[in-house]
Design a protein with these regions (language model features):
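C-terminal beta-strand-rich structural cap/linker in extracellular carbohydrate-active enzymes
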Residues: 122-173
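Active-site-proximal substrate-binding groove within the catalytic cores of carbohydrate-active enzymes
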Residues: 1-119, 133-137, 141-142, 146
Length: 173
C-alpha cells in the first residue's frame, strides 16, 4: 500500500507515521521502504506529471478488478498494477493502451522492476524490448502491487531538446 501512495503520481504524499509502529514492524524495515519510495518518486519526477489511471474499477461492488497507474514522456515510462482482491486475476493490455502512447509513435519499451524487492510478474518479461502494440496478459496474485520503470528500447527514437550555452558565460541555458 505504501508503494501505491507514490506510484499513483500525485506528487503530493502525506505520510502520517507512528514511530513506534514503524520501528516494531520487521525491525524498522518500513523506514527503508519509505526511503525507497521517496527516491523512486524523485527519480521519476520528469515522467510522473503524465500519470493516469489504467485498468479496471476496484470499487464496482461485485468484483475487484486490476487497476493501476501509468505515465510516459517519450523517453521514460512508469507502470504500476494492483490487484486488491484476494484471488489471482489476469489483465490484458498493450503498452500503447496503458501508457497512452499516440498512434503515430512506434517502437518498444524495456521494463524493469521499480523496487528492489518485488517478485516477477507472470506474463511480463523484464529487461527485454516489448513492442508497444504487443498484447500482454499478466497474472497478479491476490493483494499485490507490481511497479515497473520503462525506457525506450531505441534511444535514437527518444525526442530530445538541444541545450544551448548563454553568451560569454559558458553556463548552460
Amino acid at each position: 500500500e505504501l508503494r501505491c501512495a507514490f506510484v499513483c503520481g500525485s506528487g503530493i504524499v502525506e505520510l502520517y507515521t507512528n514511530c513506534s509502529l514503524m520501528n516494531s514492524i520487521n525491525g524498522g524495515k518500513l523506514w527503508e521502504d519509505v526511503a525507497e519510495c521517496v527516491a523512486w518518486q524523485k527519480k521519476n519526477a520528469d515522467v510522473l506529471p503524465d500519470a493516469h489511471w489504467v485498468g479496471g474499477n476496484p470499487w464496482n461492488g461485485s468484483a475487484q478488478e486490476i487497476y493501476g497507474w501509468a505515465s510516459w514522456n517519450g523517453a521514460k515510462a512508469t507502470l504500476a498494477l494492483r490487484n486488491g482482491g484476494n484471488s489471482a486475476q489476469t489483465y490484458t493490455f498493450t503498452l500503447r493502451e496503458a501508457l497512452e502512447i499516440p498512434a503515430n509513435i512506434t517502437g518498444s519499451i524495456i521494463l524493469t522492476k521499480s523496487f528492489n524487492v518485488q517478485d516477477a510478474l507472470q506474463g511480463l518479461t523484464e529487461g527485454v524490448a516489448i513492442d508497444v502494440d504487443q498484447q500482454l496478459t499478466v497474472t497478479l496474485p491476490g493483494s499485490s502491487v507490481f511497479a515497473f520503470d520503462g525506457v525506450n528500447a531505441d534511444p535514437s527514437q527518444v525526442p530530445f531538446e538541444v541545450i544551448g550555452r548563454t553568451p560569454n558565460t559558458g553556463v548552460e541555458a
